[in-house]
């Protein structure tokens, strides 16, 4: 599953043959045709009322405003649309809201893909009594 985007020599972002300005001027239905199948299906079946609230809030807020006060959402299944580029979202991970600054390369993914719900555990040394052999380790 590869997304067709690349940065040209001049540093211009393109997504499936369209630059960012073209993508931002397109309607939601036209953008949906360019997205991968799963995200396209999400949009064509109809976004929920909560999705439309986040979309409306994103359209009325500016980049500087969201940098200081990000758009808070529980919707990890919201597809990243071209009009979200430059905005900052606070995506709920199950414990807290984590900031996500939307870059052009994120178009076509879900918001939840950029904030993990589980953290990797780094185990330290076993405690006293954790194993049978550690019962006889002298205390410091």
UniProtKB/Swiss-Prot annotation:
Gene Ontology terms for molecular function: rRNA binding; structural constituent of ribosome
UniProtKB keywords: Ribonucleoprotein, Ribosomal protein, RNA-binding, rRNA-binding
Region feature (Disordered): 55-74
Domain of life: Archaea
GO cellular component: cytosolic small ribosomal subunit
Annotated Pfam families: Ribosomal_S19
Biological process (GO), any one: ribosomal small subunit assembly
SUPFAM superfamilies (UniProt xref): Ribosomal protein S19
InterPro entries tied to this protein: Ribosomal_uS19 (IPR002222), Ribosomal_uS19_CS (IPR020934), Ribosomal_uS19_euk/arc (IPR005713), Ribosomal_uS19_SF (IPR023575)
Function (record text): Protein S19 forms a complex with S13 that binds strongly to the 16S ribosomal RNA.
Similarity comment text for this entry: Belongs to the universal ribosomal protein uS19 family.
Protein name per the record: Small ribosomal subunit protein uS19
Lineage: Archaea, Methanobacteriati, Methanobacteriota, Stenosarchaea group, Halobacteria
